[in-house]
């Protein structure tokens, strides 16, 4: 990996520019769509080139490598590029755009959330301010006026972000934007972003999400269609959009500590993201329809999973998300621990009054029982443990108005603390045990998983007269029918 980072460093220009397609002249080859899509010179077609998108992924890689190894060479390369972009886009550089600030939001969002990660890694507020500025100017300084992939809504540039109320356009672009907005809201305290985020989230779960957590049902734009247009066989549901759905909802949870966001993220993770990769880890789905047969080459011209794609964002996106999941298992404040995803884990959480060792044993999502062992540093400590009670234990599988169980029976969950039944009422989707904990204390949460039949709202034409089978957080597939 170090040799690859050295190569990246050698490819970077002295001023910080780092987009090899222009540096090497590959962008001049207009026989390929990618060449035309890059523009004829750096930053000349921001609306559709992937210069800032690629740099955002590079920042995330640099931060991840630094976190894993402590080596900062790649991080320094990323910082040099970020300062270059700030100079060119918001100050002006004689070598680019005639010396005028480009002052345009990228056509494919990603750099916004990546800049926030760069801020977390370095503490430099320049990167947080850049993220906010890219969000603030979207739909303000530039709006395309074409159709399809050049329409204003395709890259969420039809309105300033604070005026947007519905999920539109390319689903991956959209979820990356919403993730960046949630990051900026949380880190800057800019609550003017909250109404738009709340409205967009509600619009997604009420009208535009498949029961698998898949987003972006429409081919062509790879994105959101009209409300309730959720076909099964023709669904697009790009794997990257499901990754974006997980990221957006996790960030909304971190901002609001409401379990409904994790409930959506969990459904998307188990039923769409993981469906996008084979058990062997080397074959992939780009698209994830809910219905197919052995004859339909639905997966970018392939009938089943493919070892690779010409545009290989989905395999690399799975490799990007899966290593992040352990870091999403728990969240904490000074005196609170939130258990978000359930899986066998062992961790140490640094609360204000001392560290807490926490282990979790479970066969979830197939097994119904989750067991915790809690051991505060020093032998005892007072804090609150918040355990998620998933939406699927109630009268519907996933938050939103779209889907409900055929039958109103609830799965009665049970909480035991050191073998004694705990009495608590969930608040914002969490049941809370607040007490002075001692080393070796045990908590057991039982989440019954009966097989359930689900129905969609009648507005979803493709699902009329149909039922979907779920158990726990999993959607089940009928094969060879």
Where are these regions (language model features)?
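Glycan-recognition and catalytic cores of secretory/periplasmic carbohydrate-active enzymes
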Residues: 1-481
């Amino acid at each position: 990996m170090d040799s690859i980072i050295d190569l990246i460093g050698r490819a970077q220009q002295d001023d910080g520019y780092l987009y090899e397609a222009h540096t090497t002249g590959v962008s001049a080859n207009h026989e390929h769509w990618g060449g035309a899509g890059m523009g004829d010179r750096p930053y000349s077609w921001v609306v559709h080139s992937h210069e800032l998108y690629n740099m955002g992924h590079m920042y995330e890689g640099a931060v991840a490598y630094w976190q894993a190894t402590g080596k900062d060479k790649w991080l320094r390369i990323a910082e040099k590029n970020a300062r270059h972009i700030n100079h060119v886009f918001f100050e002006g550089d004689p070598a680019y755009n005639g010396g005028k600030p480009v002052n345009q939001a990228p056509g494919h969002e990603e750099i916004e959330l990546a800049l926030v990660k760069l801020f977390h890694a370095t503490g430099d507020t320049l990167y947080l301010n850049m993220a906010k500025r890219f969000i603030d100017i979207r739909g303000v300084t530039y709006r395309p006026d074409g159709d399809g992939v050049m329409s204003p809504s395709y890259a969420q540039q039809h309105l300033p972000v604070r005026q947007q109320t519905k999920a539109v356009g390319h689903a991956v672009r959209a979820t990356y934007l919403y993730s960046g907005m949630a990051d900026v809201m949380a880190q800057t305290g800019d609550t003017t972003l909250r109404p738009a985020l709340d409205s967009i989230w509600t619009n997604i779960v009420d009208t535009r999400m498949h029961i698998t957590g898949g987003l972006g049902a429409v081919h062509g734009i790879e994105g959101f269609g009209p409300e309730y247009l959720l076909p099964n066989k023709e669904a697009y549901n790009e794997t990257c959009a499901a990754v974006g759905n997980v990221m957006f909802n996790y960030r909304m949870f971190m901002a609001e500590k409401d379990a409904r966001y994790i409930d959506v993220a969990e459904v998307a993770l188990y039923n769409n993201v993981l469906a996008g990769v084979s058990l062997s880890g080397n074959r992939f789905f780009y698209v994830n329809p809910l219905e197919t047969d052995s004859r339909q080459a639905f997966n970018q011209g392939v009938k089943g999973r493919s070892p690779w794609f010409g545009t290989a964002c989905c395999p690399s996106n799975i490799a990007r998300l899966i290593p992040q999941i352990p870091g999403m298992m728990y969240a904490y404040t000074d005196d609170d621990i939130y258990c978000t995803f359930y899986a066998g884990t062992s961790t140490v959480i640094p609360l204000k009054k001392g560290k807490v060792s926490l282990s979790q044993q479970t066969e979830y999502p197939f097994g119904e029982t989750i067991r915790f062992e809690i051991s505060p540093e020093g032998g005892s400590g007072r804090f609150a443990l918040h355990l998620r009670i998933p939406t699927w234990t109630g009268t519907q599988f996933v938050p939103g108005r779209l889907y409900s169980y055929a039958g109103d029976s609830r799965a009665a969950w049970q909480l035991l603390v050191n073998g004694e039944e705990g009495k608590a009422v969930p608040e914002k989707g969490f049941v809370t045990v607040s007490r002075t904990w001692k080393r070796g204390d045990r908590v057991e949460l039982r989440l019954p998983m009966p097989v359930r039949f689900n129905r969609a709202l009648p507005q979803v034409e493709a699902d009329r007269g149909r039922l979907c089978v779920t158990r726990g957080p999993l959607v089940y597939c009928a094969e060879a029918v």
